[in-house]
A protein has these predicted regions:
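Catalytic-core "active-site belt" of small-molecule-metabolizing enzymes
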Residues: 1-187, 195-215
Length: 215
């Protein structure tokens, strides 16, 4: 089997060191809001309205696999068209007994997203940063971490996300789930997106007369 490897700079309190990681699995979490029961009620109601051919899943959080070859640390990459978008997410890397935390973008082909639950994730590269923190050094202030994401459309910055990750389930909750425990190390897990800034996005689109696809 072809090896997929990334080079990560580990920024520790003890200093910085380079770590080469052979990736054993790549996956993403969806519907990972910390209010697990509230999310479950909302998804059950959606399934009742729309039937089982819906975007809602039977469990939450739920997980999807991504081809390891799609993981990239390149600053630029090619996609199929303008309806490809990303979501800034915390990314956890598990390598044996060690956990490292970085950020990445869960890319998705929005054009086919309504038709298939997982295939849109396989349509584009998944970028990940080049620097990570040891989880043991940041877990005591985990809920204070904040993630911000924006995209540039026609030269204008459109804010997408700006939230503390306290809105998401604890990392230990995700790592303890059976689907995650069985993933091969070194495992890379996109931990789920914080909510989009829908009002700010709409205001930016209107102010700069951006194309409707921006939304």
């Amino acid at each position: 089997m072809r090896e997929t490897r990334i080079e990560m700079e580990i920024a520790s309190l003890e200093g910085r060191l380079q770590r080469s990681l052979a990736i054993g699995s790549l996956a993403g979490a969806r519907f990972s809001a910390r209010d697990v029961e509230g999310m479950r009620r909302a998804m059950d109601a959606q399934i009742a309205r729309e039937g089982y051919y819906t975007g809602a899943t039977q469990t939450n959080p739920s997980f999807f696999r991504i081809g390891r070859y799609l993981l990239t640390q390149d600053a630029e990459f090619e996609v199929q068209g303008p309806l490809t978008g990303g979501e800034a997410e915390v990314v956890a890397i598990r390598d044996g007994d060690e956990i490292f935390i970085t950020v990445g973008s869960d890319q998705c082909d929005r054009e086919i997203d309504p038709l298939f639950p997982d295939k849109p994730k396989q349509m584009c590269p998944h970028p990940i940063a080049t620097v990570a923190w040891p989880y043991v050094e940041i877990k005591d202030h985990w809920d204070q971490l904040r993630i911000y994401g924006e995209v540039f459309v026609a030269g204008h910055a459109v804010p997408l996300q700006d939230a503390e990750i306290a809105s998401q389930v604890d990392l230990e909750y995700l790592l303890a789930m059976a689907e995650v425990r069985q993933l091969a190390d070194a495992m890379v897990l996109y931990c789920g997106a914080t909510p989009f800034l829908e009002e700010a996005i709409a205001e930016c689109i209107a102010r700069h007369h951006l194309p409707e696809e921006t939304a």
